[in-house]
């Protein structure tokens, strides 16, 4: 392994209407209406301002002109390429947009890209393509302006909110090349990422890989100067990954979430039925972190007021795999519940479903860690 107000979704029913990039009807593999609403119902932690939804009252681009057929995959891809704030006008009913190509962020189109589905839009990869891609070090997406090289430049802040991602597929993408492996729904290298009031169902990446992961999301490090502390954390707020049998996300590692060199704040979130399907652990082809896979050095994982349930890893950490290689990182679980995450081939003693290497034992605060 490598060394403001939050609007809660209740009774969300996303489905029925669907359209592809051609504007004609299409049927997604997963019906989002089958899924639970966004967020852990018993999660009531206060969300800091940095983790709250963004204002989208003055959008840069509105995808659609009032009908489901006008909300095409091509229109969404073009909106992402243009940057700014994106909203949707797809008519009164929930709509699923099935993509035939990945929407890619360009690093020279502003410092923030916000995608707001208005609690009615689902983005689908159709089981064939990744949904959303950002990388500060992919020259095809233009290196970000400003000081430093692509690794140290802050890049774009990507925000997705009030939206559902289904059937994203990042299988077969080479590790280390342009387009980056892992992250069936979202792959983000560099920059920063915030996810608020979102749902992720049946997103996948490769079944085998040592560090490769993130069936739903893969985030790779935005580097900072030596001694400057960890990079800006990923925010995952009031969101659902899986949530019921048949809707979980999967990959070699980190069935739902995966990262290298990245810190996370996860609040009021449900992660269940996700699977790390690899085998052989880091010396082989993965299988670590059924729900969450965190690898790196000076990294921090904070899980607050959340539920991790019925996730599975073939090797270590069916709920959480957290490894700080130089033992400077830390993990804290607060006001949360983990249960039904079966033991793989290894885990940390007295922490069912966890494998932790950090500067100190995992900090468990007012939480239940159950088998």
Language-model-detected regions and their locations in the chain:
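C-terminal motif of bacterial Sec signal peptides marking the signal peptidase cleavage site
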Residues: 15-18
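Extracellular beta-strand-rich solenoid/capping regions of secreted or surface-exposed proteins
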Residues: 77, 81-82, 98-114, 122-161, ...
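The right-handed parallel beta-helix/beta-solenoid scaffold, focusing on the short coil/turn
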Residues: 84, 95, 103, 111-113, ...
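Right-handed parallel beta-helix
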Residues: 117-119, 155-169, 192-206, 223-247, ...
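Acidic Gly/Asp/Thr-rich repetitive segments characteristic of extracellular carbohydrate-active
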Residues: 63-87
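Short glycine/acidic-rich loop motifs that flank beta-strands on beta-rich extracellular proteins
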Residues: 125-129, 169-176, 204-212, 245-254, ...
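Bacterial lipoprotein signal-peptidase II cleavage site
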Residues: 20-28
């Amino acid at each position: 392994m490598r060394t403001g107000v939050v609007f809660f979704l209740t009774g969300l029913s996303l489905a029925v209407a669907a359209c592809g990039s051609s504007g004609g009807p299409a049927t997604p593999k997963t019906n989002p209406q089958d899924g639970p609403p966004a967020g852990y119902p018993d999660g009531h932690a206060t969300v800091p301002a940095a983790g709250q939804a963004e204002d989208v009252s003055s959008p840069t681009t509105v995808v659609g002109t009032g009908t489901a057929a006008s909300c095409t995959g091509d229109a969404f891809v073009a909106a992402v390429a243009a940057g700014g704030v994106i909203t949707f006008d797809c008519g009164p009913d929930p709509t699923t947009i099935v993509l035939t190509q990945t929407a890619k962020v360009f690093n020279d189109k502003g410092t923030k890209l916000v995608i707001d589905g208005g609690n009615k839009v689902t983005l689908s990869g159709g089981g064939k393509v990744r949904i959303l891609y950002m990388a500060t070090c992919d020259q095809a997406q233009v290196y970000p302006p400003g000081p430093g090289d692509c690794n140290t430049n802050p890049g774009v802040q990507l925000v997705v909110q009030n939206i559902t991602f289904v059937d994203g597929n990042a299988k077969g993408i080479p590790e280390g090349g342009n387009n980056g492996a892992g992250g069936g729904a979202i792959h983000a290298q560099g920059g920063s990422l915030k996810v608020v009031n979102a749902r992720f169902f049946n997103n996948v990446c490769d079944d085998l890989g040592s560090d490769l992961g993130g069936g739903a999301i893969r985030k790779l490090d935005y580097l900072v100067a030596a001694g400057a502390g960890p990079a800006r954390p990923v925010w995952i707020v009031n969101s659902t990954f899986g949530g019921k049998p048949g809707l979980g996300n999967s990959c070699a590692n980190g069935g739902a979430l995966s990262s290298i060199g990245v810190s996370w704040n996860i609040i009021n979130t449900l992660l269940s039925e996700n699977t790390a399907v690899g085998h052989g652990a880091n010396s082989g082809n993965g299988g670590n972190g059924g729900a969450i896979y965190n690898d790196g050095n000076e990294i921090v994982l904070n899980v607050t007021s959340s539920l991790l349930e019925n996730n599975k890893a073939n090797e270590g950490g069916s709920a959480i795999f957290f490894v700080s290689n130089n033992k400077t990182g830390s993990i804290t679980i607060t006001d949360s519940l983990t249960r039904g995450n079966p033991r793989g081939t290894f885990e940390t003693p007295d922490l069912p479903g966890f494998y932790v290497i950090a500067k100190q034992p995992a900090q468990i605060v007012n939480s239940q860690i159950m088998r």
